[in-house]
């Protein structure tokens, strides 16, 4: 499942978005337990703001970009490749015993 770092936090003016991401986390865990006997794994990936055309439009001023970057301890915007690597890992044999997990790809945003 594709979720977001916002599935682990709250944020002003983003109540509905955060609520839907929290719901994905609950769905992921419930499905993981339900499908585990069939050896079907269910996980989610939770990226931070990712460098895409949509996000570039949202952070369209230096002030907005600076604010966003101040929230990411690693000091870099998430790349699509970062999200893809997390999904590939979770789908790989290396994650054979990983189910019900939420893999954060947030540069430390939620660690604060």
Spans of model-derived segments:
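Short C-terminal tail/terminal secondary-structure segment
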Residues: 9, 88, 99-112
């Amino acid at each position: 499942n594709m979720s977001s770092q916002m599935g682990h936090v709250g944020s002003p003016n983003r109540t509905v978005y955060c609520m839907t991401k929290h719901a994905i986390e609950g769905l992921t865990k419930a499905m993981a337990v339900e499908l585990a006997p069939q050896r079907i794994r269910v996980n989610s990936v939770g990226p931070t703001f990712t460098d895409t055309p949509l996000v570039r439009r949202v952070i369209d001023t230096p002030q907005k970009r600076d604010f966003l970057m101040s929230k990411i301890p690693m000091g870099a915007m998430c790349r699509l490749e970062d999200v893809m690597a997390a999904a590939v890992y979770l789908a790989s044999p290396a994650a054979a015993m990983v189910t019900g997990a939420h893999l954060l790809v947030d540069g430390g945003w939620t660690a604060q």
